[in-house]
C-alpha cells in the first residue's frame, strides 16, 4: 500500500513537470536597492502587512504610502471584482509574503498571484499611481503550457483573436471610479466546440486611462502571439496590466458571466482541436525553439533536476520517519492527553530540564500560572523554564494552547518557544532566555526604572506594536492575545521587546471579528470595557490593552496605582490631556531627556487606543503608521471608559460591536499617501 502511494506521488510529480512553472513575482533590477533591515525595509514590511485588510475593505483596490523622503514606500493592492473579502485578503497576504521573501533589496517589485483567485501587489520607492510607463519594464514570466494546438489551427486562431479583441475593448473601457478594481476588468469566453470553451481574463490597474489600458493589453496579446501562439494557454504580466487565457476556468473569475455572441464563421463547424504533447514543427514563430529530437532542451533538463530533487526529499523523509519509529516515544500517554502530539518534536525529557535548571534552583520570577527558572542545556544554550504550578483542567488547556500557538510563531518581537516537557502532572514550557526579564521587573522598580530612558521606552512601544500586528494580520491563523500587559513583555539584552505568555490567547477565523466568552481571562486594568462587561474580545480589545501599556511605559507606574472612587488610570490621563498638561504624566526618572513631541504623540495614540467604543480604536496597522509617520495627522480622541463604581452597565446602551473593523478609520487610512 505504501509503495503504491509513493508511486502515485512520483507519477504526479512527473506529470506535473510537463507544465512550465509559475513564478509571477518580479524584482525589478533597474531601480535602486535598499539595505535589508533598514528603515526602507521596515516601512516596506509595514505597508505590505497592512495591504490585505486595506485592499479587501476598499472595493478590491488600495494605493498608499508610508515613510518620509528616501525611505518612503508606495504600495498597491488589487483583487479581481467580486472576490470575497477572505479570498482577496488571503491572495494579497500571500503575494506580499513572496515579495518580502524573494525581493530582498529591490526598491521596486510586483507580484501577480494567480490562484485560487487573481490579485496584484506592487511596491516602489517612487509614486506610481496613474503611471502607465509599462514599456520600460519588459513583460515578465510569459508562462505557458507546453501542450500545443495540433489541428484546426486556423479556425482556432480566428475564434481566439476575436475573443481577445473584444475582451480588450471591454476591459479598457472605464466603467467605474479609478479607485475600484471593477474599472478596467473583463472576463469572457467563446465556444470552440460543443464541449470546449476558450476562457480569457484581462485587467489593468483602475488608475490608468482607457487608452493606456488598451495599449498595454494589446501589446501583451501581440507578444503572446509572437512567442507562444500555438500553446494551449498562458499569461502575460506587467505592473499595470494582466492577460490570461486557458481552455478551462481559473481564478474564480467565471461565475455568472454572459457569453458574448461569437461571429459566424464561413468554415463548417469545428472539430475539437487536438492537443499535442509536443510542439508542431516548421512554424516561423517556433524557429527560435529547439525542436530537434536529438537535443535536450533546457526546460527538460530543469524538469529532470527538479524531479530528482523531489524524489530525494521524499526518500529522505521516508527514511527519517522509519528511524524515528524505532525509538519509543517517552511519556506517550501524557503527551497525547495534552493534545499536542503535532509538536512532539519539541518535547524534552523531564530529566533533561531538571538537570538544566539544577533541580529548579534559580528562580527568575513568578506568574499567575507558575514559576520561571533559569537553566542551561548541555550545548551551553541558556533557557527560561516555566513550571506550571496549577493542576486544574484550565491550566492544562492553557498549557496546550501556549505550546501549540507559540511553536508556530516566528517574529523578532515574539518570544521564541524552544520546547516543552510533560511528566505526570508536571508540565514545563521552555523558552529562549532573555536577560532583562519582563518589562514590569524594571519599569515599576524605582531602583531600576532609570535604566529605561525615553529612547529605550519608545523602542519598546514600537516593538510591542509590531509583535501584536504580526499576531493580528501576518500569522496563520489570526491570534488575539487577550492578556497584553507589562509582565508579558520580555526584554532581550538590547531592551528589544518580545510579547510572551499565550496561555489565554485565542485563534480567530479569517472572517471573524469578535467572539464572546463566559470566562473573561486577563488582567484588570488592562481589559477593555466590552470584554469585562460583556465577555466580547477582538483585535480591538488587544488595542485597548496596548493603550494602557503605553501609558504605563510613559509614566513608569502601574495602572492600578491611580484608582480612586472618582477616577481610574485612563480617566486620570484623559484629564491631563484635556487640561493641556499631558507631560505631567512623564516618569520623573526620564527628567528632560526626551522629545516632548514624541511623548505627546504616544499619549495621543494611547488615548485613541483606550476609547470606549471598539470601533473608534485604530487597528495595529494604523497604530504602526502613527508611530512611524509624524506627517500623519491623528484624530481627536474620545473620552475613555471610567469604570466608576455604581456606573450603569454599558451593555444596555453600547451599540453592537459585531462589526469591529468598520469604516471609521477609512479616512485615516487614505491619508497614507
From Swiss-Prot:
Glycans are attached at residues 37, 53, 105, 125, 152, 191, 230, 256, 291. It is a single-pass membrane protein. PANTHER family: CYSTEINE-RICH RECEPTOR-LIKE PROTEIN KINASE 13-RELATED, RECEPTOR-LIKE SERINE/THREONINE-PROTEIN KINASE SD1-8. It comes from Arabidopsis thaliana. It comes from the Eukaryota. It is an enzyme of class 2 (transferase). Residues 25-299 are extracellular. The modification Phosphothreonine is found at residue 523. The modification Phosphotyrosine is found at residues 431, 531. The active site is at residue 483. SMART domains: S_TKc. The keyword Chaperone does not apply. Keywords: ATP-binding, Glycoprotein, Kinase, Membrane, Nucleotide-binding, Phosphoprotein, Receptor, Repeat, Serine/threonine-protein kinase, Signal, Transferase, Transmembrane, Transmembrane helix. InterPro entries: GNK2, GNK2_sf, Kinase-like_dom_sf, Prot_kinase_dom, Protein_kinase_ATP_BS, Ser-Thr/Tyr_kinase_cat_dom, Ser/Thr_kinase_AS. The lineage of its organism: Eukaryota, Viridiplantae, Streptophyta, Embryophyta, Tracheophyta. Belongs to the protein kinase superfamily. Ser/Thr protein kinase family. CRK subfamily. It is found in: Membrane. The gene is CRK13. Its EC number is 2.7.11.-. This is Cysteine-rich receptor-like protein kinase 13. Residues 321-673 are cytoplasmic. One of its GO terms (biological process) is defense response to bacterium. Residues 264-292 are annotated as: Disordered.
